[in-house]
């Protein structure tokens, strides 16, 4: 993996070494799966569900994102969505919604780094 791309992914919160271990050391496989992340609609679904008060839809989308970020080793997003899901399940919807500005910033940073993969 190009050192500049690796540095960008790392700066965006991707634990590249952990992800490569998960993908059996295959940079090509990791790259292929990372490139699918920006196309996933779960973040848009989460945002829309929170705005509409659709609690079930929001929990499902946040839980999906938590899993995706765990599998791809996007650590800040995994931690954020893990916390958000816990808040949602505790019926603390105001706190869960209040996390969206930081989650959006972290999400956009990760997507930007992933798009640099080409």
Regions found by a protein language model. Give the residues of each.
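Two-component system phosphorelay core
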Residues: 1-118
């Amino acid at each position: 993996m190009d050192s500049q791309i690796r540095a960008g992914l790392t700066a965006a919160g991707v634990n590249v070494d952990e992800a490569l271990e998960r993908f059996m050391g295959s940079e090509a496989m990791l790259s292929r799966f990372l490139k699918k992340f920006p196309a996933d609609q779960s973040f848009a679904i989460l945002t829309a569900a929170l705005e509409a008060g659709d609690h079930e839809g929001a929990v499902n989308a946040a839980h999906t994102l938590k899993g995706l970020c765990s599998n791809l080793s996007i650590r800040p997003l995994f931690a954020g969505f893990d916390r958000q899901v816990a808040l949602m399940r505790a019926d603390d919807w105001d706190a869960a919604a209040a996390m969206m500005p930081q989650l959006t910033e972290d999400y956009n940073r990760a997507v930007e780094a992933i798009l640099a993969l080409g």
